[in-house]
Amino acid sequence: MKKVLIILMAALLLVGCGNTSDKKVNTDEKVETDQKVSTDENVKYEKYSSTMTGAFDTVIQSTVFEKDEETAREYLNYIEDRYMELHKKFDSFNNYDGIVNVKTINDNAGEKPVKVDDEIFDLIEFSLNAGENYSHKTNILVGPLTELWTKYRDAYAYDEQLTMPSEEEMKAKEAEVTAMFGSPIPTEEEISKILHDISISVIELDPQNKTVFLKPKGMKLDVGSVAKGYASEMIKRELEEKGVTAALISAGGNIVSAGDVTKVREPGNQFYTIGVESPDGENFEKFDGIVAKLKITNESVVTSGDYQRFFEAEGKRYCHIIDPDTGYPANYWRSVTVVVNDSGLADFLSTALFVMSPSEVEEFMNAHKDVKALFVTDDGNIQLWGDMNDMVIGD
């Protein structure tokens, strides 16, 4: 499941940091970038950035702070190559030549266990353990449900439009989809049949042999609710092991900070500023695109929302985030932003909390005081939980 964008604020990317300057490097022709050479002799660290697409079906913006371009280029190339490598391994819906990935596990459901590498096995084990320790509302066994709802969302094809279609166009599309599938949305019968098989008992993990087996034929893993954050956390730790001075990565709605920001920002301003994107609709026009600005140092931030992948039918919005209990898309919140230290956990929790009702959220947040969260409701209100208020800049 994809996340919505968290916007890196212009103040972070473009305003000088006291002892840094700004450069962009072209990392192996992967993106078009320009280069601005600093003439400040007092510069200690310079800022280098790159942008890539393709991995995890999102735009990934990377910024590193280093003293020389060669070192920065090595880190930026590493980030891009590593994201693409992990994207292929963690992909639940596509095969790649010579790669055993999550899709390989799905292809062999009901037939045989699949031997996977440590990174895939650890991702699946992490996801299942988080389900036991935090919430079952994020469930990587919802692959058949994801596939079912994606079939309808693709038929409506709203993702490819820059603006919402007119009411007449929506009615025409709804009639077209109904003629195609017999219903404007998945039927209760289709959903109930799938829900019957969504249980922890349908998956077998063998830690010794590193095999994964889905017992029912047709069962599918969908690790999209965790994979991007998990991959981001892996890359963050690897960058720190390699000795990166400071780095900030925005992978769609996943923000991770690596290294030590205090080395590259002047005293009194030793944090990054990020903006949480506003949902669509008239209730959010007052926010001018951003519902909140947050300051972070080494935390991970992930947002889940309903306003980038959805379709509308019979006057109701159906987003891409599925409640594993009901089989239907969740609609309690417009977006949920979670801040914790681990990006994989932040990814997991942002999905789980998005699916929870207000009363379930209250119970969860009261039981997990270390989790910071920001909830946006359909009427344009913002709710802060944990110590999130300490991270918000301004009103």
Features from the language model and the residues they span:
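Mature catalytic core of soluble alpha/beta enzymes
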Residues: 4-8, 15-395
